[in-house]
Amino acid sequence: MERREEQLGAAGAGAAPALDFTVENVEKALHQLYYDPNIENKNLAQKWLMQAQVSPQAWHFSWQLLQPDKVPEIQYFGASALHIKISRYWSDIPTDQYESLKAHSFTQITRFASGSKIVLTRLCVALASLALSMMPDAWPCAVADMVRLFQAEDSPVDSQGRCLALLELLTVLPEEFQTSRLPQYRKGLVRASLAVECGAVFPLLEQLLQQPSSPSCVRQKVLKCFSSWVQLEVPLQDCEALIQAAFAALQDSELFDSSVEAIVNAISQPDAQRYVNTLLKLIPLVLGLQEQLRQAVQNGDMETSHGICRIAVALGENHSRALLDQVEHWQSFLALVNMIMFCTGIPGHYPVNETTSSLTLTFWYTLQDDILSFEAEKQAVYQQVYRPVYFQLVDVLLHKAQFPSDEEYGFWSSDEKEQFRIYRVDISDTLMYVYEMLGAELLSNLYDKLGRLLTSSEEPYSWQHTEALLYGFQSIAETIDVNYSDVVPGLIGLIPRISISNVQLADTVMFTIGALSEWLADHPVMINSVLPLVLHALGNPELSVSSVSTLKKICRECKYELPPYAANIVAVSQDVLMKQIHKTSQCMWLMQALGFLLSALQVEENLKNLHSLISTYIQQLEKLAEEIPKPSNKLAIVHILGLLSNLFTTLDVSHHEDDHEGPELRKLPVPQGPNPVVVVLQQVFQLIQKVLSKWLSDAQVVEAVCAIFEKSVKTLLDDFAPMVPQLCEMLGRMYSTVPQASALDLTRQLVHIFAHEPAHFPPIEALFLLVTSVTLSLFQQGPRDHPDIVDSFMQLLAQALKRKPDLFQCERLDVKAVFQCAVLALKFPEAPTVKASCGFFTELLPRCGEIESVGKVVQEDGRMLLIAVLEAIGGQASRSLMDCFADILFALNKHCFSLLSMWIKEALQPPGFPSARLSPEQKDTFSQQILRERVNKRRVKEMVKEFTLLCRGLHGTDYTADY
């Protein structure tokens, strides 16, 4: 045992001599893989066996492992090794051995025809790979030969065994072609050869399928074989007889699944639409399945109904345009559409009672697109036929979207509820799309139904029906501009009449109100009809998401109409926040809603509400600042800081966001005096510093503090100016004590907004120099532990160069050290950090001429940068980053041409750099290409992509075909 493990260990490490790959050692390794309880030994054996499979010795041992006295596991490995050698190492085989390899493969398949099925399949795959490698020149009639050899009467295997073995071989042949690694030009030749060879396959399949004496196992194999071959894009008319036979086989329960798969694959081939006559012949066959479909639905046979639906949808969805064009056959196509409608409306609740209806939704998109793509006159004709169909579809979809009874829904698993939620979203998307076909009449239709339902005194309505109709409105109103609609006022009037006794209905009422918030902004008189419902729902934790998101939408869209309701909204919101009814994320949304609301108030009113809203939190924060740090306190601090951040994110009394809304927007006059947010921030600044002093080493707290100021800066812009000096001072102290990425991100915001203003340049320059100095010290200690800090630092440097290059002219800035650290950052394993570093260099290099210190350091250390870039392209960095490195090369070429032309030749001189796979000619070509291209950045990116593939040995492989 020890001896074996030593051998396997050595082989696993790549140190074993080739002689170790013997039959005996392979068998021992397989025994270890299957039966050794030690997982490390299993992994070791697996690694060794993978090496054995690709070794030259595999040609020898694979045949020996197939001997009759071996167990199936060993035989399977032998067959797999044979397949790997044939498919990947075909060039190893001398031409004169092709025939013996072929004959030996046939012999083994014949022997295993009555043996292990998994071994038989692997051997068939191996022979299929061999055939593909030899076709068409070395083996021009491969498929016909296979059929002839297996039909020979002198075989020792019984006819059924031979038949099944042949069918297995014919089945895997197209599958192996689809996954083969054949070069593109060979693939075309082999595909053409196989298309011709199907003439030897289909008559055999037809005969076996229609022969009454064929056993079920053979017929099933025939259908699978046909299914495999049609994916080679065989002309649909050549498949006609087999498709008809497959339709007949649908009546046999044992053959049903295989028949469905074969029919769907045949119909779904992209080329099939060319054969319109064949498609027209298929419609009656599909329509002939309606009785079987109805019976299946009646008997709760989900598998059968699912399969028949797949067939109908495959025909309708893939060929609706071709079939619509056949005007004289419009009635048969309409019958197919109605059959698909039946599948859409199949009884029962998805996904518990049925899983079929979801298959049909894409068909309705396709049909609508095809109808609307016709020229106006033809479209009008089809609209006349299909508008009633689409109105019926809306009714069907809304019925399918209905919730089950509360009792039934209570028994559903969480997974079933989630699937139903996704299904309803799909229905919502479909309704939104159908609106394009039906227009305003669809809204009127929904409104009439809802009105009749809510005002009828004859019978009590179900909440499910009401909810579904509202859901239809919501689906459309969320994405379509319904401001012109004459039914929305009536709908808003109906909503308060809805008797809400159910969470799902209440949720949909909320979301519908939210979807109509833009309409409410244009019709403020209606706000009072629905706002009380929303505020009432805020107090229900089960309606947390819907009520808070709806209030946020109303506050955002209708903020200039809300001052009369502001006191009530703030009071209700404060109450639910204090009672902790909502989860953290909803609390944050609620604060954003209040930020929108307060933005529209006069300054005095704003400050009054603001103090009322946050005073409790400030008191809690003061108390927490006095206490010894502990985990529960940290959660509370981060929560309070998060609430303030989200409030300040949207509290914009200067209405900066509205600047993009257009001149027609009703704006309040810009208030005079200090900004309320700045007033509050100045009041709590000392408190925040006190909190920081105790939590400075905690990244989450520091991040939460920075978020308050970062979001305030983004919202307030120039209004934040009074805070700049003290914030710069605080950030400097924070970063000097414990460097954190969030502090650098906030510094970047300050540079972006205020660095260009002379009054603010001194504190920002001081902060920039300080954080740069601290970060450079971090590089000396070992920056690899802080990729987030390096990432943020590189982004800060790039922003400084972009916004205020003067920051790089300061004598106290060590530009050389910054440059060297950025080169080091290019070698980080983290992609975002590398990307940020590349971004810094693409901003720095254009400044060579205007900033003396930058020009000097590029002249001295630019070669080091180029080598780092070439190393990355040579294989040290991810291929996804090549565009970023190409940007650096382009910038070097554009702004430092004379230096680059000297450096690149020197850098590429050493053998094996940047990759041992490159020839001197390839390196020379690359350098010349780069130096020639100083205008077209896209071309440089293409050159770099080509070069990196050469460096990695991937050029011209299928692996990089889409790269």
Swiss-Prot record:
Keyword Amino-acid biosynthesis attached = no
Please list the residue ranges annotated as the Importin N-terminal domain.
45-111
Could you list this entry's UniProt keywords, alphabetically sorted.
Cytoplasm, Nucleus, Protein transport, Repeat, Transport
What superkingdom heads the lineage? Answer: Eukaryota
Expression induction or repression: By cortisol.
Let me know which tissues express this protein, per UniProt. Answer: Expressed in fetal brain, heart, intestine and kidney.
Q: Note the segments forming the HEAT repeats.
A: 24-54, 56-88, 95-135, 142-179, 194-231, 236-268, 276-325, 330-372, 375-438, 440-476, 487-522, 524-558, 562-600, 603-648, 676-716, 720-754, 761-803, 815-845, 860-893, 897-931
Task: State where it is primarily located.
Answer: cytoplasm
Coiled-coil ranges from the UniProt annotation: none
User: Entry's SUPFAM superfamilies?
Assistant: ARM repeat
- Asked if Cytoplasm is a keyword of the record, the answer is yes
Q: What does this protein do?
A: Functions in nuclear protein import as nuclear transport receptor. Serves as receptor for nuclear localization signals (NLS) in cargo substrates. Is thought to mediate docking of the importin/substrate complex to the nuclear pore complex (NPC) through binding to nucleoporin and the complex is subsequently translocated through the pore by an energy requiring, Ran-dependent mechanism. At the nucleoplasmic side of the NPC, Ran binds to the importin, the importin/substrate complex dissociates and importin is re-exported from the nucleus to the cytoplasm where GTP hydrolysis releases Ran.
PANTHER family to which the protein is assigned, alphabetical? IMPORTIN-13, TRANSPORTIN 3 AND IMPORTIN 13
Quaternary state and interactors: Interacts with UBC9, RAN, RBM8A, eIF-1A and PAX6.
This chain belongs to the protein called Importin-13
What species does this protein belong to?
A: Rattus norvegicus
